């Protein structure tokens, strides 16, 4: 409610009017992009906007749509994150960026080899794997350059010179290089192709201007759970300044602005272990000044948004006997790696390396409902689905006169048509069978396949 959408639209239009940008682009979540286009059109009824529909990005229409962007002088091009990911990027630029990443990995490997006995095999193996992955990506790009045809329009040819990224935290998983592969909490250094694709696009614009310009990130959760996310913001938006400060990788940045400590923590099996983490920022005034150069920060209080106070209630639900039994098995599995304890085949060599991830995945599913692990488990009156259905029914009766509507979310066990047991369908079953709520009054958003159906 702080006005991000309108700010994006006004900023894009004013940049065009003042010749600060010739062809700006706005990208947003699929669920929000139609609202962004409508807001822009309402603010500027005479603006020439190109809004990408799902039909425009079908295989048959995509090439024509890309040529449309290239050959026309639009005030703004608006599309979703997913659609943006389908735009080809300049192979030559990809080659340069991937080669720079590979050079950094090779430098790190050389440093580790010189350290000799002080380096673990796991650390060396991690960097060698990263080197292999980058070499494979480079080969793929080199092949794309050799086999390229003239009819492919890439992002560079489209002439986009400023990009506004709504909900930019969706692209936070960008690749980075580090020798600290055993330090907890750094995230996945390999990153995602989605984030790498965004880096290619931003670098295309920055190379054209020769400045740290051309991209605006908008988000309510810029940094959520890792200090690497702050470094990656600078990697996206301030490459020239990082280079000026001779910061060419995460380790160089962390050496200046972060402090690593070793503390004792409880692990998954409830044992105390030593954990190495970057726990503190240092040189905070300098880091804050660096961050403020690229940031405009607003809270709902700053803007004066009138919002109701959140009434958050945490319900503590004790585990069922089956869950308590499974927790003990899970702890034994985490210690021994004996997968038969969980009713599955022994772990392969690859699975053995990911043992703790497997344990965490089982723990998440078990905490929601034992039937997430095996549908043959019995229902239990004290599981979360039962408690949830009971509370929904109570609110249903309480606000029946007002025809109140409730939203129910779960990050696991979402509804999939014809896909066996899931917690959404189980809650609906309990509401209809145990509490007499008409089935027609409980709907799944997943049943709505179009924007029109969702709004209805």
Where does each model-flagged region fall?
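Conserved Helicase C-terminal RecA-like lobe
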Residues: 1-12, 16-20, 305-456
């Amino acid at each position: 409610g702080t006005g991000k959408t309108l700010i994006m639209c006004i900023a894009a239009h004013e940049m065009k009017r003042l010749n600060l940008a010739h062809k700006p682009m706005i990208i947003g979540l699929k669920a929000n992009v139609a609202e962004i286009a409508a807001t822009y059109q309402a603010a500027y009824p005479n603006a020439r906007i190109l809004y990408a529909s799902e039909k425009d990005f079908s295989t048959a229409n995509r090439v024509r749509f890309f040529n449309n962007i290239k050959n026309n002088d639009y005030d703004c091009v608006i599309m979703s994150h997913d659609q943006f990911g389908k735009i080809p990027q300049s192979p030559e630029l990809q080659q340069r960026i991937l080669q720079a990443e590979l050079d950094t990995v090779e430098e790190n490997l050389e440093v580790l080899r010189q350290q000799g006995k002080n380096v673990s095999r796991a650390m060396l193996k991690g960097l060698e794997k990263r080197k292999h992955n980058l070499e494979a990506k480079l080969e793929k790009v080199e092949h794309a350059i050799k086999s390229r045809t003239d009819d492919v329009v890439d992002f560079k040819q489209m002439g986009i010179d400023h990009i506004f990224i709504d909900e930019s935290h969706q692209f936070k998983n960008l690749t980075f290089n580090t020798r600290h592969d055993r330090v907890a909490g750094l995230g996945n250094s390999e990153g995602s192709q989605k984030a790498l694709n965004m880096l290619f696009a931003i670098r295309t614009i920055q190379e054209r201007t020769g400045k740290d310009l051309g991209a605006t990130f908008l988000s309510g959760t810029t940094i959520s759970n890792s200090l690497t996310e702050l470094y990656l913001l600078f990697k996206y938006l301030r490459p020239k300044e990082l280079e000026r400060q001779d910061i060419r990788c995460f380790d160089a940045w962390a050496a200046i602005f972060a402090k690593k400590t070793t503390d004792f923590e409880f692990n998954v099996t409830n044992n105390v272990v030593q954990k190495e983490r970057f726990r503190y920022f240092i040189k905070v005034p300098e880091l804050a000044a660096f961050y403020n150069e690229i940031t405009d920060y607003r809270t709902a209080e700053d803007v004066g948004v009138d919002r109701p106070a959140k009434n958050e209630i945490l319900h503590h639900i004790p585990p069922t006997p089956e869950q308590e039994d499974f927790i003990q098995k899970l702890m034994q599995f985490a210690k021994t790696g004996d997968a038969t304890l969980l009713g599955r085949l022994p772990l392969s060599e690859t699975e053995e390396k990911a043992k703790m991830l497997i344990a965490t995945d089982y723990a998440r599913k078990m905490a929601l409902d034992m039937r997430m692990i095996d549908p043959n488990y019995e229902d239990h009156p004290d599981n979360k689905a039962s408690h949830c259905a009971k509370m929904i029914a109570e609110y249903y009766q309480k606000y029946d006169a007002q025809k109140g509507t409730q939203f129910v979310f779960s990050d696991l066990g979402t509804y999939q048509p014809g896909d066996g047991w899931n917690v959404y369908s189980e809650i609906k079953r309990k509401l209809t069978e145990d509490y007499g709520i008409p089935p027609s009054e409980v709907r799944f958003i997943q049943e709505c396949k179009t924007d029109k159906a969702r709004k209805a």
